[in-house]
């Protein structure tokens, strides 16, 4: 499906707006879109209003840094959309839309997010991005695809991912991490549509790219995320020993790099807990889920899909522990399981991902 057909499909689906029916790197998107926007609208700087894209991104980072995204990020993004549009800054607006997709996805606001996807695709078309191979277009496609995947619109998501792959072959370096993110997200789509063999191939490639580009793979969050995704895919294939190794390795990376305060730490904790639950190590599973839930609540609040899914998993682990007569040490730390076992396998996919990203 080409871009024009895809836009028509979205227009038909959302012709009356999101209320009538019962987040990769936006900074890079901004840089890539600036030159195209200038060509499309040479007189944009004549507008009396201005929009500072870097100031917008700095403000959004500050909101996440102080862990107030649950209450502050939504209004901040909505105001930024208005400001960028009033300023006639198409590149700035595309940046805001890319960031909004990531945030809405993290909050489970999937119906609203499909409207943002449509806006982003239409804006990219107006800017002339859809006929080229710019980074801005590649990143926008990846973010749109990931948003549609989260909304379980799998056919549209897969088409967008494949368009992104085509653009990325021309616009991104072979070791660019955004290319790894594309493989990682596509692996999740394959996993969610019961194609584990394809999911495994995609994550193998993602892990290869990330490790090749890393200064220190043993203290790199992106490497950790790939190990978590791999562990959970191995778990679906009933390869428990390998799954445990990769889940534990993901936690080890956070501790080696002293990265435990990252919002993405929750994903590694929950992944390890899920593997432990499958191994009937219920005390470790409870500890992992409790720790993950605390991180999610601090970073995103309770009113999110992440919190609800993890809370339900914790409840099941606590019930299983009680039925097995297992005592849970509230002071325990998830992942403190001694030396890592040897592993021979590899590869992807995670039901619980943190903010962007991925």
Tell me the role of every PLM-derived stretch.
Residues 245-316:
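Ankyrin-repeat and related helical/solenoid repeat scaffolds used for protein-protein interactions
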Residues 301-358:
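Terminal, low-structured helical/coil segments at or just beyond the last alpha-helical repeat
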Residues 45, 82-90, 123-134, 168-175, ...:
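Flexible helix-coil transition and linker loops at the boundaries of alpha-helical arrays
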Residues 1-127, 131, 135, 340-358:
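Flexible inter-repeat linkers and adjacent short helices
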């Amino acid at each position: 499906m080409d871009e024009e057909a895809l836009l028509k499909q979205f227009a038909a689906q959302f012709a009356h707006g999101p209320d009538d029916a019962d987040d990769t790197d936006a900074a890079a998107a901004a840089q890539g879109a600036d030159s195209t926007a200038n060509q499309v609208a040479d007189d944009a700087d004549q507008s009396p209003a201005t929009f500072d894209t870097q100031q917008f991104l700095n403000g959004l980072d500050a909101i996440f840094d102080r862990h107030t995204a649950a209450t502050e990020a939504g209004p901040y993004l909505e105001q930024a959309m208005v400001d960028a549009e009033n300023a006639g800054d198409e590149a700035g607006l595309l940046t805001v839309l890319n960031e909004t997709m990531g945030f809405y996805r993290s909050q489970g606001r999937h119906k609203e997010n499909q409207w943002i996807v449509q806006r982003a695709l239409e804006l990219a078309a107006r800017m002339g991005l859809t006929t080229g191979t710019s980074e801005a277009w590649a990143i926008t496609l990846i973010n749109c695809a990931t948003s549609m995947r989260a909304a379980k619109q799998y056919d549209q998501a897969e088409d967008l991912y494949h368009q992104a792959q085509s653009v990325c072959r021309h616009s991104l370096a072979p070791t660019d991490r955004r290319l790894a993110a594309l493989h990682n997200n596509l692996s999740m789509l394959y996993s969610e549509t019961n194609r584990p063999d394809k999911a495994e191939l995609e994550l193998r490639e993602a892990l290869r790219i990330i490790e090749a580009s890393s200064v220190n793979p043993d203290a790199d969050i992106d490497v950790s995320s790939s190990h978590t995704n791999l562990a959970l895919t191995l778990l679906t294939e009933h390869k428990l020993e390998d799954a445990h190794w990769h889940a534990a390795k993901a936690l080890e990376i956070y501790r080696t790099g002293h990265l435990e305060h990252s919002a993405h730490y929750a994903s590694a904790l929950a992944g390890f807990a899920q593997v432990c639950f499958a191994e009937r190590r219920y005390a470790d599973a409870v500890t992992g889920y409790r720790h993950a839930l605390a991180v999610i609540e601090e970073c995103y609040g309770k009113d999110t899909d992440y919190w609800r899914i993890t809370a339900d998993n914790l409840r099941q682990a606590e019930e299983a522990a009680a039925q097995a007569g297992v005592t849970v040490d509230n002071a325990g730390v998830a992942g403190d399981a001694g030396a890592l076992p040897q592993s021979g396998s590899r590869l992807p996919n995670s039901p619980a991902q943190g903010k962007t990203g991925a």
